[in-house]
Structures are given as C-alpha cells and as structure tokens.
Amino acid sequence: MIKIYDTMSRDLREFVPIEDGKIKMYVCGPTVYNYIHVGNARSTVAFDTIRRYFEYRGYKVAYISNFTDVDDKIINRAREEGITPQEVADKYIAAFREDVTALGVKPATRHPRVVEFMADIIRFVEDLIEKGFAYESQGDVYFRVEKSHNYAKLANKTLEDLDLGASGRTDEETARKENTVDFALWKSSKPGEISWDSPWGPGRPGWHIECSVMSTEILGDTIDIHGGGADLEFPHHTNEIAQSEAKTGKAFANYWMHNGFVNIDNVKMSKSLGNFITVHDALKTLDGQVLRFFFATQHYRKPINFTEKAVRDAETNLKYLKNTYEQPFTGNVDAQELQNFKDKFVAAMDEDFNAANGITVVFEMAKWINSGNYDASVKQALADMLEIFGIVFVEEVLDAEIEDLIQKRQEARANRDFATADQIRDQLVTQGIKLLDTKDGVRWTRD
C-alpha cells in the first residue's frame, strides 16, 4: 500500500487512484529563460523517481510536465540576448532536455508549452468572468480571491495573514484591483512586448492560469497528483487551486506533493549569495548519474545539502554498486532471500517514496550479492531497483586483448605459474582493470 504525504492535509494518506491501475500526474516544469539550477533538477529528479516507482508497482502513468515559455523573465532575457522570446524559450528548452537526459530523467508523457494553449487560456478566463470569479480592469483580468472557498489552505494561510508582496505587486497594479490579494489571470501588454489578441485587448496570460489550463485540457478537471517544489505552494499552486475549482466546481488534484530545497554548504542557494549552481555547470565536473544518485540520499521532502564531500561520497557509493552489478552472476539463486530484499525495498518506497531508505535496502542487497555467487535473476532484481532512481549501468565489453589476458592469467594460475599470473595482473592494472580472485572465480572491475 503506497502512502503519500499530502501537503493539503499535512498527513500521510493511502494512495487511491481515480481509476484503478492508472495515474494522472502533473508536475510544474521550468520557466525557460536560463539553464536549470540544481534546485530545479532536484524537483525534476524527485518526481521522475516517483513516476518510475509507480510504474515499477504496475501503474500506467500519464506524466505531464510543462514548459513555461511565456513570462516576463523570458521577455527580459530576449532583450539582453538580442533575440526573440521564442528563440530564448527554444534555446533553454533544448538545454533542459540535454541536462535532464544526463540525469537519467525519462521524457514526460507530454511536455506542453503555454503558446500551444493560448485560445484555451482565453476561454478559461472568459468562463471565470461569466461565473463572477474574475473581472476586467484596464485591460487586465484579475481573480476575485475573496470568492474562493478556503483560499490558501494549501499553504496553511488565511486572507488575513497573506504576504501582500508574494506576487510582486506594484502600486499601479494594486490600484486596478478590487482587493489587494486578487491575482492576475491576464495582463495587458506594453508597447513592443509579445502579446496575443483577447476580448480585453492585447496581452498575455498570468503565470498561474497557464498550468491550470494545460493540466485540465490534457488530463481533465481532476487529477491524481500535482507536484512541484516547496516554493510553489504559495502563491502558484494556491492560485491554481482557486481558479481551477472555481471554473469546474471539482477538486483540482487529490494529492499535493512538494519537494524540499537544495542548500549549498548549509546555506540556502541564491543568486545574490553567489552560490547558485546550474546543472549545465555541475555536469562539467560531475557525471550525471552521480548527481542523480546524490539526490536519492535524502527523502524528497527534506532539504538536501550540496557539498563536495556529499557528492564525492555519492560517487564512491555508486561505483561500489556498479562493481557489484558487473559481477558474473553465474551461481544459484536464493529465492527466499531475494524475495525478502524485494519486499523490504517495496516497504521502504511505499512509505512516501522514501528513496533514502530504499537505497539502504539496495546496499544491503549488494553486500549479500558480494558475499556469494548468484544467478541472473538477482542481477535483474538489482537492476530493476536501481532503474527507479534513474541509475542504469551499461555493461562494459572488454576488448579481445584484455579478455585474452584474463584467460591466460587463469591458465597460468591453474598451472601454478604465479610469476606469469602476477605479471599479467600488473599489466591489466595499467589498463585500468582490477581483478578480484574469489572462491567462485575471477571478478573484475574497471578503476
């Protein structure tokens, strides 16, 4: 039984899908104006792991993660780089795909872009106006927050204690509103800015309406899971809930999931502090699988501390698992013990996708593997577990010369010609091949 920590209820809840065997899941993707940073990557990796685990447990997952390609930040970056907003979005979408591929992230079932849904967004806003939940003011359209039942419940806030600066309001904008907490559904454009025609004049959608429309258009009015970083609880996800449920009269999502932040050397990552690390830069010195494995060392909801030591520890541990995986696996299987490991792994992951505990079981299993010689079913079980964390080991094929040397060394040992055997071992070491002589035969690793 899978349990999920639901941000809305602030409790572990048994997962019950809308439709048996199927899951509809929407995760907020990046605003594509720059390379993603390691905090963005953690969110992408966390929900990729969750998706993979659902699939491991037999569910068919419709996994949607958007690209926000209409935003003030994109417009500003276009001015800086002297290109169009469309070119900025295309450039950083390509960079995102390259980065997350290096991290072993599976492509979403669909990666929608805001520009593909402009007509749907306009119809959504019109519907909210007709229902009395929104109003037009000087070319802008705002949502009437006071009409929303339990607004900001997700963030555990009330209208009275909301941070009025959360949406970056200006005095000019506030003057156009009926209430200072109302948020924009549609924003009129300034001269020279990218815009789309609408019943309220040329403009572009607000950030929050974009995800509501893409989610409901692709997955329907109610989805199983909506996810994203903890920073999205308010105002983004809060406003998504308000506008979506106002339009449909139905629950927007049955479970809300949020991942924790990434700290750099115990300090919150921020551009102002100069400790901002993009994945593009991190991958210049780190293997993508190492970074991915590092993220798995902490529960997805907890903050994780990015340090040189933590990353290098992840690298060492990943190498140990790789060496374990590359053993011959030519022995027998202990079916009961193997099933025990599978059951322990499922129990760990069923408890709100606790990757850290799941990885602990993987290491216990690796220790067991290294203590004996088991068959290919054990290897497959190890591979299946690791794949949930996006770790796929490609077995290295030794070239003919190295294979021949290993065979000759085995023959020399059989003939008690230990001088020749040692000479061949030393020769293999110079080629990065380390041999391990065990009671079950020779195993090798590549340094």
Predicted region positions:
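Alpha-helical recognition segments enriched in aromatics with Gly/Pro capping
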Residues: 1-31, 48, 118-327
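N-terminal, positively charged nucleic-acid-binding surface of large information/translation enzymes
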Residues: 9-14, 18-106, 437, 444
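Short phosphate-binding/catalytic loops that engage adenosine nucleotides
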Residues: 59, 133, 433
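Short, glycine/charge-rich beta-strand/loop segments that flank catalytic centers
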Residues: 67-71, 93-96, 106-121, 139-148
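Non-catalytic interaction-recognition regions
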Residues: 97-119, 123, 233, 288-290, ...
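Structural preference for alpha-helix termini/caps and helix-kink/transition segments
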Residues: 268-447
